[in-house]
């Protein structure tokens, strides 16, 4: 499917692809997709949505646009990835589309906002339900300092003819689907409700499909409860979603906690305007029990075998990225900024890994927005390959041809009176494993 612009691209059973054909000029908006289309194996369009807004930018022929960005979901699948018994429909059904509209809301700022909206679109391409993020600002729990920063600078982007504030920047959206919490009587987790995350505000929340109101949230403040403090600051996150009920961990929430920069607060040395005020130079993948508000599984630099915080940035993608729970209980992680996709077991062993060799033309990086694993049967046009196990290299002993043998030294002597290092007290920075004085 050469030339498609899906962000993400999602393969459906039968060899179909849900994607987009391009973007609006960056002079006039930010990350506005022209349309959302479903194409077959031969590239024929079998479904299309673009009638969100008619756009007539200067010097460009007017046209209808979806203004889609970052995510979409087809009825039948809550997350867009494989879960037993939860296949997306390919010839019918509604589609949730994450999109943009410009907005004004003096409660947030006197500046124009690039607002996130969720559109439910039927098979005929008609919008049958919609939700507007800015209308629920009062439900999000911003403190006074972050509100003041937002009012001054709602993540301003210098578009024409008037700039706009990409104030929330929702980057994932999915339906909860059947789950054990709702089965136990917790209405916050109604199967029709929708979970989203806003990377610019460091917030994850669930929307009631019936009322539009926020029923559950984590952030933007992580100092307001013992549970939030224990989880720790989630910064610039991506791909928050509820694990489908037919997969291990069903009902828990997965999120790629990027770190990097995100959130609004009072100005500080790392964020002199108060925008992107929280900073961290490593990433975490978290699985959270949304009722107990506790981390039940994680993959962080510590689980990856790196000494934190000194070596934490060896697992780090400050933007994009995601993860997928697999039927075998493993987790497929996209460390997006480096184009790395790898599968880890519940006890954090890497059992499969891929690094993209492809770099972009205009952005010379091998970044990968979000990877998905699908069953071979979903793409019947391609013969099922023979899987071959590969023994992982031991990088501590591996040598390229012609290099000296491991451990080969000209001479080794002992010096009388030398004392060995004892623990991490040899380092200038305390590790996360060092005990704190309580």
Could you tell me what each predicted segment is?
Residues 1-438:
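Histidine-/acidic-rich catalytic cores in large beta-rich domains
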């Amino acid at each position: 499917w050469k030339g498609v612009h899906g962000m993400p691209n999602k393969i459906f059973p039968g060899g179909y692809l849900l994607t987009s054909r391009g973007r609006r000029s960056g002079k006039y908006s930010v990350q506005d997709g022209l349309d959302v289309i479903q194409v077959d194996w031969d590239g024929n369009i079998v479904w299309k949505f673009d009638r969100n807004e008619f756009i007539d930018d200067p010097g460009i022929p007017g046209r209808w646009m979806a203004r889609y960005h970052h995510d979409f979901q087809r009825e039948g699948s809550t997350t867009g990835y494989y879960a037993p018994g939860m296949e997306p429909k390919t010839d019918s059904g509604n589609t949730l589309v994450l999109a943009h509209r410009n907005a004004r809301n003096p409660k947030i700022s006197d500046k124009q906002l690039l607002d996130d909206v969720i559109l439910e679109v039927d098979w005929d391409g008609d919008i049958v339900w919609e939700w507007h993020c800015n209308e629920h600002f009062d439900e999000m729990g911003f403190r006074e300092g972050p509100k003041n920063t937002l009012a001054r600078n709602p993540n301003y982007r210098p578009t024409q003819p008037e700039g706009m504030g990409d104030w929330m920047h929702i980057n994932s959206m999915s339906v909860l689907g059947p789950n054990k919490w709702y089965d136990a009587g917790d209405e916050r987790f109604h199967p029709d409700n929708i979970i989203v995350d806003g990377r610019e505000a460091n917030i994850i929340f669930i929307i009631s499909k019936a009322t539009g109101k926020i029923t559950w949230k984590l952030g933007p403040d992580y100092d307001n409860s013992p549970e939030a403090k224990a989880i720790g600051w989630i910064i610039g996150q991506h791909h928050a979603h509820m694990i489908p009920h037919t997969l291990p961990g069903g009902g828990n929430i997965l999120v790629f906690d990027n770190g990097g920069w995100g959130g609004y607060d009072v100005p500080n040395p790392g964020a002199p305007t108060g925008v992107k005020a929280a900073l961290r130079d490593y990433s975490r993948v978290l699985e959270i029990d949304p009722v107990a508000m506790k981390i039940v599984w994680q993959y962080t630099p510590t689980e990856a075998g790196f000494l934190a915080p000194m070596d934490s940035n060896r697992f780090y993608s400050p933007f994009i990225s995601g993860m997928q729970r697999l039927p075998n209980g493993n987790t497929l992680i996209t460390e997006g900024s480096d184009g790395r996709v790898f599968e880890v077991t519940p006890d954090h062993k890497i059992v499969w890994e891929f690094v993209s060799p492809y770099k972009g033309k205009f952005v010379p990086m091998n970044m990968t927005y979000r990877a998905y694993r699908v069953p071979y049967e979903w793409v019947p046009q391609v013969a099922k390959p023979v899987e071959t196990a590969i023994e992982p290299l031991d990088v501590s002993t591996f040598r390229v041809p012609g290099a000296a043998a491991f451990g080969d030294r000209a001479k080794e002597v002992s010096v009388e009176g030398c004392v060995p290092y004892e623990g991490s007290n040899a380092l200038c920075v305390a590790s996360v494993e060092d005990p704190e004085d309580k």
